[in-house]
Amino acid sequence: MRRDFDRRQKANAVRKKVEYSKRLNENRIRVLQAREDAVQALLRDAQASLLSLSLNTAEYSRLMLSLIVEGMHKLGESPALIRCREIDVPLVESLMPQVEAAYRAAHGREAPNVRLDTANPLPPPPRNAEEQSSGERVFCSGGVIVTSSDGSIECTNTLDDRLRIAYMGNLPALRGMFDT
């Protein structure tokens, strides 16, 4: 009878430890999920900011000038092709004289020959923030891709890619902000 009582008592203690461990793990999972939800909310806010940035004509124009010059410098090839969204074609065309001057000023040499690749535009922007976060279709919030004339070398300077790179590079720090 004593052995039976001890066996039941040990089984009861094991069951309590298992229950405690199960509750502890469930709480850990809830905390991790809440932290991941908060990080994803930050990403969605940043994506929404990209949408509004491309609507601010003056600021977006300055940004596009910088992105094109930077892409041309990184590529280091001549001639080069610039790909942009269809809605950005007039802007990029109007920036071409400024691009050459900015490149010359920044790098102290003549700008490479570039032309706009209108045959292969980047995807259009998302219509709203919900579409942007849904992932149902490919979109581009702005920026350019500068490629070599044969397309073998590509410098992606789109806002979405820059956000993705910044997000991935800072993900540990972002998650750390929500540690308890």
PLM features per residue range, with description:
Residues 1-25, 29-36, 40, 44, ...:
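Amphipathic heptad-repeat coiled-coil alpha-helices used as elongated oligomerization/stalk/scaffold segments
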Residues 29-180:
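Elongated, mostly alpha-helical coiled-coil "stalk/stator" tethers of large membrane protein machines
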